[in-house]
Amino acid sequence: NSEAGLTVLEYWNKLLNEDKVYQLGFEDGLGGDGFKAGKVAMTFNGPWVLEQYKEAGLNFGVIGQPKGPSGDMHAMMGGFGLAIPNKAKHADEAWEFIKWWTTQPENGVEFCKISGNMPANKAAAEDPYFADDDVFEVFTEAYTYAGIRSKVLGYSDVEGLALIPQLQKYVAGEISAEEALANAQSQGDSILAEAAQQ
C-alpha cells in the first residue's frame, strides 16, 4: 500500500481500460490459456507451461521481465513448495529426501525435466539442459534478479487471500486502486498477526 503500488495499479488500469490490451473474461472457454489456444498474442507465465506450448505446436519465443521505471527487474521464485508437517511420521526421511533432491544438481535437473519448473539449486540451473536452451536461458537469467518468497508464517495466505482478491475486484471495476491497496494491507496484516499467534 504505497505510491509505487498505486502507480502500478494505475498503469494496469490504463493497459486494460484505455489501451485495451486485454479484456476480462476473454479467455473463458479457452481452458484458461488463450495463448495456448492461439487467441492471445502474448502471455505472462513461467517455465512450467513450456512443454504444453511445445505439445500444442506453438511457434513462440520468451523474453525476460519488463523493467520498471528505475530500470530494475524483479521476479519471484518459489519457497513454500517443500514442507514437512510438524506431525509427519517420517520427518527425518522427508528431510533426507529434500536434501537429496535440492542439493545434488543432477537430481534437480532430472526433477525439472519432469515438472517443468526451474531448479532451486543454481548449479543445477547451469546444466546444459537449461544453459544451452534459448528458452530456458531467459528463466535462468531471472536468477540474477529474482527474490525468494518470504518464509514468514502466513505469507502465502496474504498473497492468495488478501492481495489477489483485491486486485481482482480492482480490475473488475468494483473498487478503486486506493481501496484495493488499503483492503489488501488491512487483510494481510490480520492474516500475518493471526499466523504469528500460532
Q: What kind of feature is each model-predicted range?
A:
Residues 1-25:
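Glycine-centered hinge/linker elements that transmit conformational signals in sensory
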Residues 1-7, 55, 66-75, 122-133, ...:
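Short, solvent-exposed loop/beta-turn-alpha elements that line the ligand-binding surface or hinge
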Residues 14-17, 145-198:
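Conserved C-terminal helix/tail region of periplasmic/extracytoplasmic solute-binding proteins
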Residues 23-37, 67:
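Short helix-initiation/N-cap motifs at beta->coil->alpha
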Residues 41-46, 61:
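Paired acidic/hydrophobic, glycine-rich loop segments that form the ligand-binding mouth/hinge
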Residues 63, 113-161, 169, 194:
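Long, aromatic- and glycine/proline-rich binding clefts that accommodate carbohydrate-like moieties
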Residues 77-90:
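A bilobed periplasmic-binding-protein/Venus flytrap-type ligand-binding module shared by bacterial periplasmic
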Residues 98-120:
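Periplasmic-binding protein-like
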